[in-house]
Amino acid sequence: MKIDAPRKYVTDNLKYALDPGSIAVVGASRYPNKVGYKVIEGLQKWGYDGKIYPVNPRADKVAGLKAYPTVMDIPDDVDLVSIALPAHLVKMVLEETVKKKAKMVVIATSAFKEIGRGD
């Protein structure tokens, strides 16, 4: 996806970051001490009333919610994708996110430069 007017894109779509109707949590974990679990737990605890889609190829459920193997397997539209994965997996997930036509992405990972990657 090439964005010709990035500022306009952000202002037009900021609502999807601040008040998304649905959130996919990529890297959702069954383990309560992991970031991918904490994201879902926080959303549930703080009363988020939109749809939450845990994404984990090795789990059927995460935090009581049906899990999906990939972003592309989610049957509905996704407003926000939260990525809680190691840096080497982020590019692949971003490509899926673009194909899914998600509106916004939040990435929580090690900084690429810190691990010797400049991409």
Where are the predicted features?
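Catalytic-core regions of core metabolic enzymes
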Residues: 1-119
